[in-house]
Amino acid sequence: MITIKFLIALLLLPCLVLAEEDQPLPGHSHVGDAFDEGPRQSASLLGGTGKVTIPITSSWPKAQAYFDQGLGQLHGFWYFEAERSFREIAAHDPNCAMAYWGMAMANWENAKRAKDFTAKATALKDKATNRERLYIDAHSNYFDNDPKDAKKRHQEHINDYENIIHEFPEDLEARAILVCRIWQFSRKGLPIHSYEAVNAILDQIHAKDPMHPAHHFRIHLWDKRKGSRALKSAAQNGPSAPSIAHMWHMPGHIYSKLHRYQDSAWHQQASARIDHRWMLASRVLPDQIHNYAHNNEWLVRNWIHIGRTQDALAMAKTLIANPRHPKLNKITKRSSSAGYGCARLIDVLTKFELWDQALALVETTYLQEEDLSLAHQRDRLQLIGTAHFEKGNNGGLSEAIVSFDALIIKAQELHQESAIKAVEKATTEKKSKKDREKAVKAAGMKTSSLIKSLEQAKSGLEAYLAILNNDLPKAREKFGDIKRDKYALALIRLRLGDNEEALKLSEEATTKKATGQVLPLAARIEVLHGSGKTEEARAAFEELRKISSSTDLSTPPFTRLIPIAAALDLPADWKLPATVHDDIGHRPELDTLGPIAWTPPNAPDFTLPDGDSEPIKLDSFLKRPTILILYLGHACLHCADQLQAFAEHHKQLEAAGFNVLCVSTDTVAELQKSQQAYAKDGENMPFTLLADPECKIFRQYNSYDDFEDQPLHGTFLIDTNGKVLWQDISADPFDDPVFLKKEALRLLPLHITS
C-alpha cells in the first residue's frame, strides 16, 4: 500500500534540487536567523508617528524619513512596525549601521534578536558618524553581558546615554530614550532616586518641542506615583503621534488613576479603533500588536466602572472571537486576547448579574470548558454556581459544587507531575539534596496556590447552597470563601438580615479607591435604603447620578433602584449629564478612527492554472470554508512535512466541511510531473494544486518577503464570504492541521456575516 508520506515524496521528487549545506531553508532569511521573525513586508511612510529625528548616514535618499518614522514608532512602543521601518532602510542600504540599531531597539525585550541586530550595527559602525557610534556602542555595551550584574549593567547603559547628551546637548532623542530606560530599569531593581530630576529632563525636551512624543514617558513616570503631574501630557500624548494606537491608550493610565473612567475609556476605545484600522490595512493579527489585548481588556473594566453593560459585554466577546494562534494568542496565556477575553466576559456577566446569559454562554464557544486552563475552568464553574444561586436553583448549584471535585483532582495530578519533573531536572543537573528539595517546593508553589483557590471556590458555592437551604450558621461559617466584590457580598449580607455587616461591607466597597464606579455605589444605596437610612441613601444616590451619564439602567443592579428612586422622589431617568473636563485636549470623532472590533480582511480573489493548465478560481472553492496553503514548490523539503500533515488529515478536514487548496511557486509543467507521479500508482492527488511561479498570489496575501524578494510559507482560513479568519505567515510552514481544524470550527460561528 502506498502511504501518504510516499505520495508527498513523489510530489516533491520531480526536479528536486538539493540545497547546499550552507543555504537557508526556503522561506528563511538569507541575511541571518534574526530576520526570520518580525515583519517581512515593505514599509510605507504613514505620517502621524511623531516629529522626531536622529541624523543618520545612508546612501538611500529616503532613509532619514523612514528612520525618523521608526524612531517615533519606538517612542510609541509600536515595535513590530518600528522594525518594519528600519528593515526598509536596510533593504535599500544594507550598510546603514543605524538601521540595525533601530531593529535592535525594536526588540528590546527580545535579547537574542536584539544581540544579533546589535552585532550587525557594530560591524558597520566605522561607516557611521561619531554620534551614531555612541548610540550603537550603548547597545553593544548593554548586550555584551558585562558586567554580569544586571543593576550595574543598567546603570552603565544610563551612563552611556548621558554621555551622548554630554557630547550632543541638542539631542532630544537621547534624552527621551534615557528617560524611557530609567523608567524601565526602575521596574527591574534600579530605583528612581529623584522623580523630579527625571521630570526635569522631560521639561527640557518639551521646552524645545511641546509636542514631542516623550509625553508617553512622563505618563509612565508619574502613573504609579502622582498621576495629576501628567495630566498635561495625557492631553497631548495622542495628538503627538496620532497614528500610533498605544499613544492614545497611555492617557487612560492617568485618567484611570484619577478615577476619570469616562476619559480613560474614550482613550482606550480610540486605541482599539486605530489598532483595528491598522489590522485591516496591514493584515496583521490582533495579538501581533504590543499591548493590544491589555488595552481592550482595560477598556472592558472601565466600561464596567461606568455601567456600559452592553459595550463591555461586546468587547469581552470580541476578544474571545479574535483568532487564536499557538505562538501569539493562546487561551492558557492570561495576557492574550483569549485569556483576557475569558476573564473579562466572566467579570461582566457576574458584576451586572446577567445570569441567564451566563448560563447560556458557558455552553457556547465563548466559554468552552475543554479549551480553558484550570484557572479559567475554576472561574467558569464559579460563574455557573453563582448564577444558579442567584436564580434560586439548588440543583444546578449542587451540580457545580460536585464538578469542582474533578478540577481539584486534575490540579493535584498537575502538582504531582510538576514535582516529578522538578526532581528529574535537579537530578540531571546533579544538584544537592537540599537544592532538589528547594526545586520541588518552587515547582509546586503555583499548583499549590491553584489547589487552594479551587477548594476555596468550592467552599464559597457551599455557602451559597447553605443560604438557599436556610442553613444560616453554615452560610455564615463559609461566607468568607465566597469570591465576589465587597459590594456584592454586602447585598448577600443584607439578604441574610445581617444589616450591620452589610453596611460595613458596602461602606468599605465605596472608599476612595472606588470613586467614580457606579456598581459599588448602587449597592450602597440598596443597603442604606434597606437598613432604613433614607437620608444617607439619598446622598449616595445624588453621588451616583453625577457619574451615571452612560450607565445602562436596564440591568439588574439598576432596575432594583427604580422603587428606591421613586421613594426618594427622583425622576425615572435619574442620570445627570457627564462632566466635561477642560483639560482633555483635542479629540477626533471616534467613528473616524476605525472599527471597534477586529474585522476579518477580504481574501484577494485569484485565478491560477492547475497541473492541466485549467484555470481555477478561488471563488469556486468558497462554497465551503477553505484552507489555503501557499507552499514553496518541489525543492522545499519542509513543505513536504506540511503537505504530509494536511494530507493525513484530509478526510477529517473534508468531513468537517473544509476544502483544502494549495498554491505552489512551481510552474504548470512541474505540477504536471507531480500529477503524473501520482497517476502511475493509481492514486488521486489529495489536494488541488495551482501554479503561481511569479508569486503574484503570495504577494497579495503578504506571504512574501519584500526585503529579500522571496516567497514565504502561508496558511489561511477563508470563510464562505471570502474573509480571512485566520493566518500563519512564517519562515516555516504551519504543520498542525488538528489545531487549525479546531480553531476553524471555533471561529466560523463567531464571524457569521450576512
Q: How should these model regions be labeled?
A:
Residues 711-754:
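Thiol-/selenol-based redox modules, centered on thioredoxin-like
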Residues 106, 140, 181, 185, ...:
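TPR/TPR-like alpha-solenoid repeats
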Residues 179-183, 188, 195, 213-225, ...:
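Alpha-helical adaptor scaffolds
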Residues 640-683, 695-699:
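Structural microenvironment flanking redox-active thiols in thiol-disulfide oxidoreductases
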Residues 20-218, 227, 239-241, 259-270, ...:
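N-terminal alpha-helical interaction modules that lie
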